[in-house]
Amino acid sequence: MKHFAFPDKAWEKKVTIGGGLMAFLLISDVLGPEQKIASVSLLSLAISIHTLGVVIMMAADCQKYYTLKYHQGLIKEGLFKYIRHPNYLGEIMLYSAYAMIVQHWIPWAILAWVWIGVFLINILRKEASMSRYPEWKEYKKKTGMLIPKLF
C-alpha cells in the first residue's frame, strides 16, 4: 500500500531468485530454532510497538512525499521537527516487534546487519546530502537522528 501511495524510487530494487530464496529461508522455520509461544504481555508490547512503528513510518513517508512534491528542500515540520529520519525509526520499530515475538537471537542478528549495513549507510548518505542546505547545522542541533532530543 505504501509503495502505491508514496512511491520512493530509492527503495525499488529487483530481487534475485537467490535473494528471494534466502529471505524465505530466514522467515521460515526450516533453518530456525524451536518456536516459543510469546506471552500475552509480550504480544501486547510487540503489537503496540509495531502499530506505532507503522504509524510513524507511514506518516513520515506521506509527509516527505507530499512536501517534496510541492516544495524542495529540508523538511523541518511535522515528525521531522523532532527526528531527522522518522521513517527509519518507524521501520526499526516495526521489525523489532517481529523479532521480539520470535524470542531468539537470530532475528536480532539479522536486523543488526540490516540496520547497520543498510539503514545506517543510507541515513549517513542522506545526512551528507542534506548538509548542503544552509539551515542544516541549526536543524541538526535541534533534532535527533532517530530519537528526539530532549535538551
Language-model region placement:
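Hydrophobic transmembrane alpha-helices
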Residues: 31-151
